[in-house]
Amino acid sequence: MNASAAALNESQVVAVAAEGAAAAATAAGTPDTSEWGPPAASAALGGGGGPNGSLELSSQLPAGPSGLLLSAVNPWDVLLCVSGTVIAGENALVVALIASTPALRTPMFVLVGSLATADLLAGCGLILHFVFQYVVPSETVSLLMVGFLVASFAASVSSLLAITVDRYLSLYNALTYYSRRTLLGVHLLLAATWTVSLGLGLLPVLGWNCLADRASCSVVRPLTRSHVALLSTSFFVVFGIMLHLYVRICQVVWRHAHQIALQQHCLAPPHLAATRKGVGTLAVVLGTFGASWLPFAIYCVVGSQEDPAIYTYATLLPATYNSMINPIIYAFRNQEIQRALWLLFCGCFQSKVPFRSRSPSEV
């Protein structure tokens, strides 16, 4: 009986050992589903096991009932997609209003339309980037989407610069500027800015990327550090020019107010209030632009691909807000566009005030 008990204990030990070995083998052969991204997608997008997930990572959950892998969406990507949706909706409305209203086809509104078109493309790019990132994860698609976004945002910033130059010239040469400014000249200016923006967007597609040299990647893959340095430097130059022009605009406004004061022997309260309001508006315009883009531009210069991806998201998301605010600052505050909105949505709104082309400083 002791022999049979010993044999039984020995068989139980062998069975337990066999079960343990099988469990270990199963664990070794089963991938860890808590890691970022499927292996193939991570390798294709450059989002491997490094600490920085760039903007191209998604986590993988266990298989569902149908056997398909469920992709966990990054909340930051959702925020960018939502931002892109709002941007696209706002700017599509502005583009439609300018295109469908003959009175809004003056040179000033052509510049505003260019800004709205660039922001519309940027919003669509954010939406497509989200869709393709989780549906078609590939190097080619990633490269095309990044180039598209670079070109769109570059065109947006360039259009802002063109509007600033137009505002400055309209105030500095108020007597002769409107007679010299033509629609053809504005179109040529915008053609030049869009050509430069398109060139910046094509650079990564034409080979200036870090797909072949991971060590040269920036905080936004597949852009190289030298490429984002060029983009950031270009932004700093544009921001510096805009700052200089807006300071000059404020000087012109205050000089005009001082001349009125000399003529009237005092600065009338309406003129003082209008001057302060104009300067405050310029401060809001420039402050919004700087607060939106400066953090991302600075981080692109000082950041590194080893930094956590959250730093890139946290600075890029506010930059997209600039394209969300632009329609409010440059379009919806304008009386002609407000009237066009009434005509579009109501159809019965009648105004006895005829359309007039306002100066860019009033936009």
Curated annotation (Swiss-Prot):
A lipid is attached at residue 346 (S-palmitoyl cysteine). One of its GO terms (biological process) is regulation of metabolic process. Disulfide bonds: none annotated. Residues 1-75, 132-143, 207-231, 306-310 are extracellular. It is a multi-pass membrane protein. The chain crosses the membrane at residues 76-95, 108-131, 144-165, 187-206, 232-250, 279-305, 311-332. Keywords: Cell membrane, G-protein coupled receptor, Glycoprotein, Lipoprotein, Membrane, Palmitate, Phosphoprotein, Receptor, Transducer, Transmembrane, Transmembrane helix. GO terms for molecular function: sphingosine-1-phosphate receptor activity. The modification Phosphoserine is found at residues 357, 359, 361. Glycans are attached at residues 2, 9, 52. Residues 96-107, 166-186, 251-278, 333-363 are cytoplasmic. It is found in: Cell membrane. One of its GO terms (cellular component) is cytoplasm. Residues 28-51 are annotated as: Disordered. Expressed in the brain, with a prominent distribution in striatum. The keyword Phosphoprotein applies. Its main location: membrane. Orphan receptor with constitutive G(s) signaling activity that activate cyclic AMP. Promotes neurite outgrowth and blocks myelin inhibition in neurons. Belongs to the G-protein coupled receptor 1 family. This is G-protein coupled receptor 6. It comes from Rattus norvegicus (Rat). The gene is Gpr6.
